[in-house]
């Protein structure tokens, strides 16, 4: 972490004073927390990368340094129709325009590393809760990322504070938690994944799973959401062992997941991309099947698979 303060500038260069020194590695990002830059969110390289991703038919496109909803809409114009857009909330302007950004996105990433540079550190936990709460209310996928198990870059076990951090993110309603440096440059990538998985499983098994059921999830399709909410209520009241959903787009399991049922959600789909995208949803286990023609076939394959 290096901190510079600009002391003099011209149109093409600047002179700075090193306030906090350190090792400067290649390909590192530069943040300007006290400035509003007029740079385009999408560069020519970004557009070329998106085109390459379209050729591969990628499942997700994560958009860095989103400022407003227009940034998301501009990306949607370029990607394949069924590719999901994940907005990375990293800037002050993104926090200011949070609701409109979430509304236009398929999912949101709480990018705490860059947020911690742009905003005072003491505000980050509250902002994280606001992002997750607003995303859950709008029925969007959520990812919490950055510095979750930083100590495990060099240590074989996490700190107590890191365990609490991951636990609170799950209790706040995140669908997914993500590792970064721990697995990309760390000494213990496998141990890091195992530690995070163990924490997630423990929270899911022992916590009050109804902590999100009290929220009124206000997604656009009110009928589908009402049916999903009713299905979860019936499943909870009857102590059902599983909830089964058949889907092509992934919308139904997303809504079911947002209501945090006690039972796991088994989702059957014929679409490869939907199968992959369902990996990010809380409490969902997906099954790839061939196309079925009747509801009798659906009941048959569900019963056969669940046994």
Predicted regions and their residues:
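Non-catalytic helical/linker scaffolds that mediate oligomerization, partner binding
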Residues: 1-307
